[in-house]
């Protein structure tokens, strides 16, 4: 089977989704987009109450169903204070880190739908003026958002319709290189949505009906901890998360591999499911690594704590610099696709 033909499709779908702002709690536009993309492939799907997307990928045995969980929500910011000088103090949505957004362009989206450009900068950001520039710890007390508007006071900002509670969305800066790398904010976990679309297209192209019912839940609150709590159909016995694979010191995975997670901070994954994923990687010739993630949790942890009696596992394309300006590779995406194809028969 020539899986490589799905590489360009996966990256194109990923890039399109990356360019739609979708911080946790504001995923409605992304949900409409994802729903339309699955429907274009011929799959029935619906938008959930929490603005996720639920997809029925078909399959025979509905008493031994498999749920695939990925998330389309991302990190972001929200205005916490409009300062007297017209600058904005923000609060993080999810694990947004001030170090990683300093100097990044952003958009403030008001509750009425107006959009204003801005940039995140250190307070007193001119190094020729600020003698403490190098020594200042970057937090959201010291990194602020400047609107690209002629505002000098809180009143000026409010005249624009900007208010506390408005979302701040950071530029993903999507780049796809000739060598197959994809660089962007929020590859966690929009790359996995692209991979899942690639898997859905593979099933259609090959005319495959899985032996077991397969569902997908593209969640909308993973980054804040309650994405996978709901939408587990009756008859589902396994839930497998497709989320970013960790890349870093002490781990074996890199961006051109699929990572199979044996344990994260929530504990070990199901023994048989993990073994099955490893066996699928070997069978399909996928370049893989088995790793332990020390500071990681996923949708399926919330599925379990919500009380669902399912076996669980986790795989994902290797992604470097998580929660920052992330990097992965088409080979890692294709390796993940191969494992899905090999595991779900």
Region roles according to the model:
Residues 1-345:
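N-terminal hydrophobic/helix-forming segments and targeting peptides
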